[in-house]
Amino acid sequence: MAVPKKKTSKGKRNQRHAVWKAKAGDAAQKALSLGKSILSGRAQGFVYPIQEEDSEE
């Protein structure tokens, strides 16, 4: 069975954890910004279907 030869240092572990947390923070910030733009109506990247009125009746 494969095992690591040496223990990973706390510094390396913390560095990897910080990178992971930074990516999660960036994703959360992007999602929040996108949600705000959708709610305010300033979103340019979405196509909303136009509700057509029933004129056949």
Swiss-Prot record:
It comes from Prochlorococcus marinus (strain SARG / CCMP1375 / SS120). The keyword Zinc does not apply. GO terms for cellular component: large ribosomal subunit. One of its GO terms (biological process) is translation. Belongs to the bacterial ribosomal protein bL32 family. Residues 1-20 have a biased composition (Basic residues). One of its GO terms (molecular function) is structural constituent of ribosome. This is Large ribosomal subunit protein bL32.
